């Protein structure tokens, strides 16, 4: 506020003022001890004259005032005791009015006036009216403000309100209100005028110091809020209009903001609701620089809490049309305050929506109306780039998700997706993730194609690239999390009616196909499994599974074939092969042999043309064999074709051990442990013997390249297959076959440098232990094992 020299001067002036107060207070106390009224008045007036200074800032003046205030309390005690000064309080009240300077005179008058009221020798209202009028004589902003603050303080417990010791006639409450209102009005005028004190160069610091004095003015409103007998009618007709008149007319940013805050905080919620129109009208008349959004937000928060306090008050909100009034007021504020940044408007919409969801959660039209107003405002700006505004829009969109446990409710809001369209790509994804998380958290089921359409429009930022953003630029971990969330969401889409479920699948498929090669491997599998689940549902319900109805397994399999085919162009052949096999198994369960055969054909074509990696080939072969084993829909010709292909691929794998394992796995294709399953023991034996030859070749290659035959694991694995089929009753597997294989393994182990013991291979040891256990156990199976010598 001041230069360094000015600050030093001010400190010096404050020190001089305090010294003056202390000096005169010393003589005043001597006079008090001597009960010398004339000297008391003389030195108290001199002491209070120090408050006449105009050299101090508000903060420094406050320090000086508090020193004088402490002395005035001692003076009041003296004035109360008539035996000490010998004058009736009426005469004393007249006497102090002869003090030379007006400021000391008024402080003394207020002090004696307090004693005068307490003596009840005059009505409280008359004394207070006299004092509040005479205080007009001090018009210096700082001196006048502190004088009236002193008057408010000494009169607080002496107001003529209902139930007090100073209660008067029928209009007693009005008298108390009138005094406080008059003092408030004058104090606010003085407070506002402080900003014009001193040069313009010190305005910023002056405003800060003026802000520190705001409670001196605000205390009057707190007193008004606590006066007994101020009912709704008096508040509506007198108190609020007078206070708001002063707020609006003062044309001061700081005063308007602070006083509106005070009004909202100190008066009852019920009063705010019943005077909502008046209060909101004042908000629209505030200075453009006033942060009206905070004022309105605080008002809506209070009203929301009031509504939540009891269901009985909700009808009051409907009676006064609270939502319509708040909505109109917010619209006016946004339209008139042209300088309000977009974040301010969004904050107001968030507050209004929060109010609506708490007070009228059943009125979706209100919720959609707020979102619609937000769309209009967002459409008026070229592009939403303010991060704070974006955060508020996310809060706006999140509020319905948090309020309604069923996400379907939010999907019915027509303006919801229109708000999301104004988000940037990154924020759109954040919001889409929040929507999916809300569905997962509440375990919501989206059960109609229309709602799925709306939902996938909302989360399109996760499904496809927006604004030409390249998916390759995204963080891999974040990208995977997003796509896994979409995959989980697909499993939450369900309907018991097959036709509607098929519509849902088609809607999802249409959206997912726009996702590009990087997303499809995440999103296609859950779609396929969802469709397969529908197929199994139809199969369990019976009916014409290949008929002309809109939802039949045959038609669903056509969609599945087209969907999986897209994966082959990604390319993602291993995943496509797995899905083809899943569909083949489902087609088998529906007894659709041609469809199942077609899916196997597609799987074999992928294997031949797309899968070149040796490890991937091994995995694919075992998947093919495992699936083919479980399928029993094929006739002899088709099954022979497929099993021949599978065994042929197995024998052509790159590594001998892989060949061996794949070939002996094919043995299960000819012996299915099921009453109706195929049981071709001869071909089982052929597979096992072929596997044995491959294992032997692998041993010879190991011996040639490494100088030792290596482990006998392959032989032991084949031995276990022999034992399996032997126990299953394959007549072509005999004890002598098992015996020969055991001896072969023993020989292989002993020939490896001649120092390997029988027990060096745990797998082989465990297998022999099993055979021994079965032999000892006896019974039919034990008898079968008897010819085998260990």
Swiss-Prot record:
Expressed in which tissues: Expressed in siliques and maturing seeds (at protein level).
GO terms for cellular component: cytosol; endosome membrane; Golgi apparatus; retromer, cargo-selective complex
GO biological process: protein transport; retrograde transport, endosome to Golgi
Membrane topology classification: Peripheral membrane protein
Gene3D superfamilies (UniProt xref): Vacuolar protein sorting-associated protein 35, helical subcomplex Vps35-C
Keyword field: Cytoplasm, Endosome, Golgi apparatus, Membrane, Protein transport, Transport
Main location: cytoplasm
Subcellular localization: Cytoplasm; Endosome membrane; Prevacuolar compartment membrane; Golgi apparatus, trans-Golgi network membrane
Highest taxon in the source lineage: Eukaryota
Pfam family, one: Vps35
First and last residue of the signal peptide: none
This protein's record includes keyword Signal: no
InterPro entries according to UniProt: ARM-type_fold, Vps35, Vps35_C
Function as written in the Swiss-Prot or TrEMBL entry: Plays a role in vesicular protein sorting. Component of the membrane-associated retromer complex which is essential in endosome-to-Golgi retrograde transport. Also involved in the efficient sorting of seed storage proteins globulin 12S and albumin 2S. The VPS29-VPS26-VPS35 subcomplex may be involved in recycling of specific cargos from endosome to the plasma membrane.
Subunit-structure text: Component of the retromer complex which consists of VPS29 (MAG1), VPS26 (VPS26A or VPS26B), VPS35 (VPS35A or VPS35B or VPS35C), VPS5/17 (SNX1 or SNX2A or SNX2B). Component of a retromer subcomplex consisting of VPS29 (MAG1), VPS26 (VPS26A or VPS26B), VPS35 (VPS35A or VPS35B or VPS35C).
Family note: Belongs to the VPS35 family.
Protein name: Vacuolar protein sorting-associated protein 35B
Organism: Arabidopsis thaliana (Mouse-ear cress)
């Amino acid at each position: 506020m001041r230069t360094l020299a000015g600050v030093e001067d001010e400190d010096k002036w404050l020190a001089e003022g305090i010294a003056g107060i202390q000096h005169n207070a010393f003589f005043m106390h001597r006079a008090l001890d001597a009960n010398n009224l004339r000297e008391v008045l003389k030195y108290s007036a001199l002491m209070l004259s120090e408050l006449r200074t105009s050299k101090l800032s508000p903060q420094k003046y406050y320090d000086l005032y508090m020193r004088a205030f402490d002395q005035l309390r001692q003076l009041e005690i003296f004035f109360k005791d008539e035996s000490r000064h010998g004058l009736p309080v009426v005469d004393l009240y007249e006497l102090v009015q002869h003090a030379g300077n007006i400021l000391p005179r008024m402080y003394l008058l207020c002090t004696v006036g307090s004693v005068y009221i307490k003596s009840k020798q005059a009505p409280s209202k008359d004394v207070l009216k006299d004092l509040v009028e005479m205080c007009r004589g001090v018009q210096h902003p700082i001196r006048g403000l502190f004088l009236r603050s002193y008057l408010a303080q000494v009169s607080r417990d002496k107001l003529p309100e209902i139930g007090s010791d100073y209660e008067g006639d029928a209009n007693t409450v009005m008298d108390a209100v009138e005094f406080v209102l008059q003092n408030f009005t004058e104090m606010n005028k003085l407070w506002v005028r402080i900003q014009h004190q001193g040069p313009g160069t010190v305005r910023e610091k002056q405003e800060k110091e003026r802000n520190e004095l705001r409670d001196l003015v605000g205390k009057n409103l707190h007193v008004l809020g606590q006066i007994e007998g101020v009912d709704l009618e008096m508040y509506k007709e007198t108190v609020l209009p007078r206070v708001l008149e002063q707020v609006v007319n003062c044309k001061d940013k700081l005063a308007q903001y602070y006083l509106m805050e005070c009004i909202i905080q100190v008066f009852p919620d019920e009063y705010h609701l019943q005077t909502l129109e008046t209060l909101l009208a004042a908000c629209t008349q505030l200075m453009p620089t006033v942060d009206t959004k905070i004022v309105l937000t605080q008002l809506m928060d209070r009203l929301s809490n009031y509504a939540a306090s009891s269901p009985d008050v909700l009808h009051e909100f409907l009676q006064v049309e609270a939502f319509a009034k708040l909505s109109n007021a917010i619209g006016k504020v946004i339209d008139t305050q042209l300088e309000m940044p977009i974040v301010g408007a969004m904050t107001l919409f968030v507050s209004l929506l929060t109010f609506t969801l708490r007070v009228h959660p059943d009125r979706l039209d209100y919720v959609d109306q707020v979102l619609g107003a937000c769309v209009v405002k967002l459409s008026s700006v070229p592009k939403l780039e303010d991060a704070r505004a974006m955060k508020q829009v996310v809060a706006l969109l999140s509020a319905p998700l948090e309020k309604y446990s069923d996400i379907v409710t939010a999907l019915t809001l027509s303006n919801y997706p229109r708000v999301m369209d104004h988000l940037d790509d990154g924020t759109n994804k954040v919001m889409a993730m929040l929507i999916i998380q809300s569905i997962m958290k509440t375990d919501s089921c989206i059960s109609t194609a229309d709602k799925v359409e709306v939902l996938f429009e909302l989360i399109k930022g996760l499904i496809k690239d927006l604004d030409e953003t390249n998916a390759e630029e995204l963080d891999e971990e974040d990208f995977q999390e997003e796509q896994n969330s979409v995959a989980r969401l697909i499993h939450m889409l369900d309907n018991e009616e097959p036709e509607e479920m098929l519509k849902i699948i088609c809607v999802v498929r249409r959206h997912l196909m726009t996702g590009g090669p990087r997303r499809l491997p995440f999103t296609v599998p859950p779609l396929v499994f969802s469709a397969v689940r529908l197929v199994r549902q139809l199969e369990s319900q019976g009916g014409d599974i290949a008929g002309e109805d809109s939802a039949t397994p045959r038609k669903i399999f056509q969609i599945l074939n087209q969907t999986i085919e897209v994966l082959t162009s990604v390319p993602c052949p291993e995943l496509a092969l797995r899905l083809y096999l899943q569909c083949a198994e489902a087609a088998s369960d529906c007894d659709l042999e041609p469809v199942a055969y077609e899916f196997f054909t597609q799987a074999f074509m992928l294997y031949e043309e797309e899968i070149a990696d040796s490890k991937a080939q091994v995995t694919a072969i075992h998947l093919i064999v495992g699936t083919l084993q479980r399928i029993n829909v094929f006739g002899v010709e088709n099954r022979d074709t497929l099993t021949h292909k599978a065994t042929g691929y197995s024998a052509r794998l790159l590594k001998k051990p892989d060949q061996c394992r794949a070939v002996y796995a094919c043995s299960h294709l000819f012996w299915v442990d099921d009453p109706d399953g195929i049981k071709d023991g001869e071909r089982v034996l052929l597979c096992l013997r072929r596997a044995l030859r491959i294992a032997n070749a692998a041993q010879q290659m190991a011996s040639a390249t490494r100088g030792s035959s290596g482990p006998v694991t392959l032989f032991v694995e084949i031995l276990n297959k022999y034992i399996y089929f032997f126990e299953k009753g394959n007549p072509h597997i005999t004890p002598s076959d098992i015996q020969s294989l055991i001896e072969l393994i023993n020989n292989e182990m002993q020939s490896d440098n001649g120092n390997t013991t029988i027990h060096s291979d745990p797998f082989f040891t465990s297998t022999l232990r099993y055979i021994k256990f079965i032999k000892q156990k006896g019974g039919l199976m034990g008898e079968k094992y008897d010819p085998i010598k260990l």
